């Protein structure tokens, strides 16, 4: 099983989520939309929170703090099962997007497109509110 970590980067005090802009799709998945939650694979021996910090640093150039696992989803992609762990946290710093991310957008839930990679906007709203409840 492949374990993917999708990160829900919360911009503290703004009610906004930072989404990655990936022109031409991500891993060849252009049909899944232009905006994605930053994501990557869980490395051998790595904890999900550590992976989330690494992914946000490597893809957006930002720090991620207060990480919490807020959701999971299993899906069959091609010939392999993927387990997606959604880890939320607060971002800080100046963004510096790196490949495969071509840009980013800080958006409120109402401003998000319907589809964020493998996640629908309604899923992201539930996960975001779960993060807020867990951090309270």
Predicted regions and their residues:
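The catalytic Nudix box helix
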Residues: 37-71, 87
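Nudix hydrolase/Nudix homology domain
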Residues: 32-33, 96-136
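N-terminal strand-loop-strand
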Residues: 1-35, 64, 89
């Amino acid at each position: 099983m492949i374990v993917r970590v999708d990160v829900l980067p919360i911009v503290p005090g703004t009610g906004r989520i930072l989404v990655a802009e990936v022109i031409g799709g991500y891993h060849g998945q252009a049909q899944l939309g232009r905006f994605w939650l930053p994501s990557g694979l869980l490395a051998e021996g790595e904890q999900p929170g550590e992976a989330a910090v690494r992914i946000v640093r490597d893809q957006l150039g930002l720090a991620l703090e207060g990480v919490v696992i807020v959701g999971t989803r299993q899906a069959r992609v091609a010939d392999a099962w993927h387990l997606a762990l959604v880890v939320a946290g607060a971002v800080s710093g100046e963004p510096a997007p790196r490949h495969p991310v071509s840009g980013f957008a800080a958006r409120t839930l109402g401003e998000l497109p319907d589809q964020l990679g493998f996640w629908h906007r309604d899923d992201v709203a539930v996960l975001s509110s779960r993060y807020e409840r867990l951090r309270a």
